[in-house]
């Protein structure tokens, strides 16, 4: 199925809308002390896609793997939102199994598993039976049911559903191919009202770089404390702003947007534009003057910037799987769904153990660890 599997310089990673599979992201992780690995591979279209048995087209693709040390003696290979290449459902497990075995020789000897944080669409998001009478998604089934379906056609039946997803597995994509008025019309009336209210009240959004890092971090600390979130060090965000963005085959355009009112920072966000997609990566806001709707001003500015820079879609990056008020991300769902767009559910994190015994111990230890990180 796969051939010409080889390492490649991460600077040569192919252009992609997936931020976490770019040379830019490799540089971010390298600045933070992680190892990164680029792997190139080829496949025939007929081996990957249903009803393409006569198509001999050769597909060339790649992945970025981040090597994460979990202790002094063991590491894992984490593949954030990769691979981008998404075969037909019946070939996915087989493809990923062969890819795992093909990249095994390139990984450190202490690597005990490969973790794919898949952006592939969830099988159950394509199934009408998994939506209720109101069109609300019921979510993924239990892990055993997921594993049974995912391992279809594999030789080793080796894939395990991770206990939690690291990157968001539910998001909303906005279509930016239409004009600004059409984009606004697709929003909920309350969202349009709040965007216009923030403008009337004098909220202004400006673009900053490293000079805005301290402003961002103060807002971020306030947000983390208010919502009981894990607090990342300022060096994490500094790495995002310092990373090389335009010297590779997969460039990125990073903007730190700050919403202000009368010179007072009220909200901030990181916008990253890669290929045809703008992505809302991180956000923070003050508890003061929330009635001025600065977060709405930020999102509208990010949407307009993305469109102006040639993006055809905008990723809202992370919501609850359904409008369930008891879910910790329900507030994000309610806010982001107001901007219109299509809800997308992905498969999330899947593990391919390289050392079964050590992997079993790792899973036990992971149950008690914090399950949501910036990665």
Question: What are the language-model segments listed below?
Answer:
Residues 2-14, 22, 43-49, 121, ...:
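Active-site/acyl-donor-binding loops of N-acyltransferases
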Residues 91-110:
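Short secondary-structure subsegments characteristic of cysteine-rich extracellular domains
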Residues 79:
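Phosphate-centric recognition/catalysis
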């Amino acid at each position: 199925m796969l051939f010409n599997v080889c390492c490649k310089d991460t600077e040569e990673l192919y252009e992609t809308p997936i931020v976490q599979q770019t040379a830019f992201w490799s540089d971010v992780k390298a600045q933070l002390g992680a190892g990164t690995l680029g792997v190139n591979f080829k496949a025939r279209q007929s081996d990957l896609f249903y009803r393409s048995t006569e198509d001999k087209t050769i597909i060339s693709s790649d992945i970025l793997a981040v090597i994460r040390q979990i202790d002094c003696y063991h590491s894992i290979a984490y593949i954030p939102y990769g691979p981008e290449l998404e075969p037909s459902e019946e070939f996915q497990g087989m493809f990923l199994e062969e890819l795992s075995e093909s990249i095994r020789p390139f990984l450190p000897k202490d690597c005990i598993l490969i973790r794919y944080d898949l952006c592939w669409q969830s099988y159950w998001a394509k199934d009408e039976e998994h939506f209720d009478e109101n069109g609300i998604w019921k979510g993924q089934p239990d892990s055993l049911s997921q594993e049974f379906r995912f391992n279809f056609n594999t030789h080793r039946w080796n894939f395990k559903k991770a206990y939690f997803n690291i990157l968001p597995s539910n998001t909303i994509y906005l279509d930016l191919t239409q004009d600004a008025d059409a984009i606004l019309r697709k929003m909920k009336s309350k969202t349009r009202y709040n965007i216009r209210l923030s403008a009337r009240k004098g909220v202004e959004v400006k673009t900053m770089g490293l000079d805005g890092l301290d402003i961002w971090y103060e807002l971020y600390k306030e947000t983390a404390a208010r919502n009981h979130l894990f607090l990342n060090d300022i060096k994490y965000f500094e790495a995002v702003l310092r990373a090389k963005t335009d010297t590779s085959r997969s460039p990125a355009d990073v903007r730190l947007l700050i919403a202000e009112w009368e010179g007072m920072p009220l909200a901030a966000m990181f916008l990253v534009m890669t290929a045809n997609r703008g992505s809302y990566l991180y956000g923070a806001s003050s508890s003061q003057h929330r009635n001025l709707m600065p977060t709405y001003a930020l999102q509208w500015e990010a949407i307009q910037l993305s469109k102006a820079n040639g993006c055809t879609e905008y990723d809202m990056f992370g919501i609850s799987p359904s409008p369930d008020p008891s879910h910790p991300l329900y507030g994000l769902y309610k806010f982001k769904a107001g901007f219109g767009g299509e809800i997308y559910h992905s498969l999330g994190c899947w593990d391919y153990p390289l050392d079964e015994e050590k992997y079993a111990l790792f899973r036990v230890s992971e149950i008690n660890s914090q399950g949501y990180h910036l990665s």
